[in-house]
Amino acid sequence: MALNGFGRRVSASVLLIALSLLSGALILPPAAAQRDENYPPPGILKMAKPFHDACVEKTGVTEAAIKEFSDGEIHEDEKLKCYMNCFFHEIEVVDDNGDVHLEKLFATVPLSMRDKLMEMSKGCVHPEGDTLCHKAWWFHQCWKKADPKHYFLP
């Protein structure tokens, strides 16, 4: 049976859609970050503010860079990476090798968030990077990729 022009276009379109789905070429947008008056939890943001302020001052990172990483896209910024490292050191959850002690980190968050953080951390155990700042960034980008909806950077 010969297909007319319209039939060929429809068949070709269906074939392209099927191939896209099968090959993974159809990219779905990442989950949008959850942001409202209750998330990120105001109590955590209040607790984190002194550490945040100290690390902004020490590293010179911009609030815009922090917000973009937290709410937008993963990006590389040396000052941001060092802010992340500073924050880990300020809350005393990282050792001198740049390894985050997850049990200490879990203890710093309320029970209501602990399960999310534990789930987010499953594949984020062995940091890569040549410096402490790069290792800190590795953890954060790993967590953000694992759960972009709930990840936030205070």
Swiss-Prot record:
Tissue and organ distribution: In the ventrolateral region of the antenna, expressed in two distinct types of olfactory hairs: in most sensilla trichodea and in a subset of the small sensilla basiconica (at protein level).
Any single biological process term in GO: sensory perception of chemical stimulus
Gene3D superfamilies linked to this entry: Pheromone/general odorant binding protein domain
One Pfam family linked to the record: PBP_GOBP
InterPro entries the record matches: PBP/GOBP, PBP_GOBP_sf
Protein localization: Secreted
CDD domains per record: PBP_GOBP
Signal peptide extent: 1-33
Disulfide bonds: 55-86, 82-133, 124-142
GO cellular component: extracellular region; extracellular space
Coiled-coil boundaries: none
Main location: secreted
Keyword set, alphabetical order: Disulfide bond, Secreted, Signal
A molecular function (GO) term: odorant binding
Record-stated family: Belongs to the PBP/GOBP family.
Protein name (Swiss-Prot/TrEMBL): General odorant-binding protein 83a
Source organism: Drosophila melanogaster
Lineage: Eukaryota, Metazoa, Ecdysozoa, Arthropoda, Hexapoda
